[in-house]
From Swiss-Prot:
GO terms for biological process: translation. It comes from Polynucleobacter necessarius subsp. necessarius (strain STIR1). Part of the 30S ribosomal subunit. Forms a tight heterodimer with protein bS6. Coiled coil: none annotated. Pfam families: Ribosomal_S18. It comes from the Bacteria. Binds as a heterodimer with protein bS6 to the central domain of the 16S rRNA, where it helps stabilize the platform of the 30S subunit. Keywords: Ribonucleoprotein, Ribosomal protein, RNA-binding, rRNA-binding. One of its GO terms (molecular function) is small ribosomal subunit rRNA binding. The keyword DNA-binding does not apply. PROSITE patterns: RIBOSOMAL_S18 (PS00057). This is Small ribosomal subunit protein bS18. NCBIfam families: S18.
Length: 84
C-alpha cells in the first residue's frame, strides 16, 4: 500500500434498514402528524417506497393513506410545483 492512500471501502456494504414505527411502538399513523409524514415524501412530493425507507408493509399502507388524506386536506403538497 502506498503512503497517503486510504484502503478502499466495500462498495457493496449497505446499512441495515429498520422500521421507525416498530421501534417507536406506534400503533396507528395519523394524518395530522405532518412533521413525521414529511420525512417519507421526496423532494418532488412523491411517497418514498418501503424498500428505501425500511418501513414494514403494515405501516407503509397506513403511511400511504395518511399522506393522501393530508394532501386532500392541503396539509401536504400534491407536487413540488406549488409555491411555498
Amino acid at each position: 500500500m502506498a503512503f497517503g492512500k486510504k484502503p478502499a471501502q466495500n462498495p457493496l456494504f449497505k446499512r441495515k434498514r429498520y422500521c421507525r414505527f416498530t421501534v417507536a411502538g406506534v400503533e396507528q399513523i395519523d394524518y395530522k402528524d405532518v412533521d413525521t409524514l414529511k420525512g417519507f415524501i421526496g423532494e418532488n412530493a412523491k411517497i418514498t417506497p418501503a424498500r428505501l425507507t425500511g418501513t414494514k408493509a403494515k405501516y407503509q399502507r397506513q403511511l400511504d393513506t395518511a399522506i393522501k388524506r393530508a394532501r386532500y386536506l392541503a396539509l401536504l403538497p400534491f407536487s413540488d410545483q406549488h409555491k411555498k
